[in-house]
């Protein structure tokens, strides 16, 4: 059987177009998701985790919603590797559950949103091969939460070269873009994959007429703004000022920012222009021209995005918004735990680890 024929072999629901077929089951799905969100780690857990060693943190999550994942993988992995695989497994199973409990238009929107994990996995596979990582090391970072199955990704990770991976994806929608990868332009390919994802997601949302889709669109557009703003700060700090260098790195469809207007402004003027946006109160204290790290700025913007998704989920409580809010917060929890594990493993101070966390 061809690899591409197996990519969605275990997840047929991920490939079905339910945009017009089937019945959306909002009350049932939202009730289930609210129960799932109530099981996310409370913010009070994180100071405790920072005071623990790796073994203690592993025992802690083993007593939480990650219990089955840790137990399932404990015979094969240990330490940070165990945590990485357990977190990824839990994310995949959690999101797969969301696909199974949603129907109709709701399912269609959830599936479209989760395709971001296919983009993540393709990037990880290419990056791994370029840097000669082992198949095992590559698998540690893959998350089977999109349309690709764990088995198919294992086969891709086992390929000898990035060219073989691209050839295995010959019949996928990503192949025309991946053909442009020559082994030296990874940053370009990764950026184009991101833009491809958002173009597809905006296409799935369409021209929103219902309150439901308008909220969905607003959350996605806010995310695009946050991504573009972080990239603009990186480029400004790196001294990149040319419009033709900056605009190819921007994602279209943001909520408020106009990257083409901000791109060529000197740093001080760029910051002044941001004072007119909703993001200024969030970042005003961390935009000095002599700042050496963007970690705090990124954390604040991510927190704002998370908080905004929650606010919007309350605007329309029986809609896709609470489900999208849960997906976002679940991902953030896994990211926080991964940062703690890896930080402890590499000997980072608790203060440095804490600075990277986004705790709501």
UniProtKB/Swiss-Prot annotation:
- Asked if the keyword Mitochondrion belongs to this entry, the reply reads no
- UniProt source species: Methanosarcina barkeri (strain Fusaro / DSM 804)
UniProt-listed SUPFAM superfamilies: V-type ATP synthase subunit C
Q: How does it sit in the membrane?
A: Peripheral membrane protein
Q: Extract the Pfam families matched here.
A: vATP-synt_AC39
The segment annotated Disordered runs over 1-25
Traced from the root, the source organism's taxonomic lineage reads: Archaea, Methanobacteriati, Methanobacteriota, Stenosarchaea group, Methanomicrobia
Described purpose of this protein according to its UniProt entry: Component of the A-type ATP synthase that produces ATP from ADP in the presence of a proton gradient across the membrane.
GO CC, sorted alphabetically, is: plasma membrane; proton-transporting V-type ATPase, V0 domain
Which terms does the UniProt entry file under GO BP?
proton motive force-driven plasma membrane ATP synthesis
Subunit: Has multiple subunits with at least A(3), B(3), C, D, E, F, H, I and proteolipid K(x).
Predominant location category: membrane
Please give one Gene Ontology molecular function term for this protein: proton-transporting ATP synthase activity, rotational mechanism
UniProt-listed InterPro entries = ATPase_csu/dsu_sf (IPR036079), ATPase_V0-cplx_csu (IPR014272), ATPase_V0-cplx_csu/dsu (IPR002843), V-ATPase_V0D/AC39_subunit (IPR050873), V-type_ATPase_csu/dsu (IPR035067), V-type_ATPase_csu/dsu_dom_3 (IPR044911)
Q: Which UniProt keywords apply?
A: ATP synthesis, Cell membrane, Hydrogen ion transport, Ion transport, Membrane, Transport
Can you say what this protein is called? A-type ATP synthase subunit C
Q: Which PANTHER family match?
A: V-TYPE ATP SYNTHASE SUBUNIT C
Query: Which family, according to UniProt?
Result: Belongs to the V-ATPase V0D/AC39 subunit family.
- Tell me the compartments it is located in: Cell membrane
């Amino acid at each position: 059987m061809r690899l591409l024929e197996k990519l969605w072999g275990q997840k047929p629901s991920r490939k079905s177009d339910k945009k017009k077929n089937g019945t959306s089951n909002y009350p049932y799905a939202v009730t289930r998701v609210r129960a799932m969100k109530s099981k996310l780690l409370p913010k009070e857990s994180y100071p405790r985790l920072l005071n623990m060693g790796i073994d203690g943190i592993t025992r802690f999550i083993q007593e939480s919603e990650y219990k089955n994942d840790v137990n399932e993988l404990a015979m094969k992995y240990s330490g940070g590797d165990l945590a990485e695989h357990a977190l990824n497994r839990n994310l995949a199973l959690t999101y797969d559950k969301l696909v199974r409990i949603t129907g109709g238009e709701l399912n269609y929107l959830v599936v479209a949103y989760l395709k971001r994990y296919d983009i993540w996995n393709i990037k990880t596979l290419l990056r791994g091969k370029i840097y000669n990582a082992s198949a095992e090391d590559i698998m540690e970072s893959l998350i089977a939460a999109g349309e690709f199955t764990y088995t198919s990704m294992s086969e891709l990770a086992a390929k000898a070269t990035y060219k073989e991976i691209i050839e295995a994806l010959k019949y996928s929608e990503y192949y025309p873009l991946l053909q442009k990868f020559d082994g030296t332009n990874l940053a370009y390919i990764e950026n184009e994959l991101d833009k491809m994802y958002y173009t597809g997601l905006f296409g799935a949302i369409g021209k929103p007429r219902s309150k439901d889709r308008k909220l969905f669109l607003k959350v996605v557009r806010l995310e695009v703004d946050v991504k573009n703003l972080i990239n603009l700060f990186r480029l400004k700090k790196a001294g990149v000022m040319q419009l033709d260098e900056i605009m190819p790195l921007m994602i279209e469809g943001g909520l408020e920012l106009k990257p083409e207007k901000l791109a060529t402004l000197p740093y001080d003027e760029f910051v002044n222009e941001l004072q007119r946006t909703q993001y200024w109160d969030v970042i005003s204290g961390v935009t000095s021209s002599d700042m050496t790290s963007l970690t705090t700025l990124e954390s604040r913007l991510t927190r704002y995005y998370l908080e905004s998704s929650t606010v919007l989920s309350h605007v329309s409580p029986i809609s896709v918004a609470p489900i999208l809010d849960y997906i976002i917060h679940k991902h953030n929890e896994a990211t926080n735990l991964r940062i703690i594990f890896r930080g402890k493993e590499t000997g980072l101070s608790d203060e440095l680890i804490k600075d990277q966390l986004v705790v709501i």
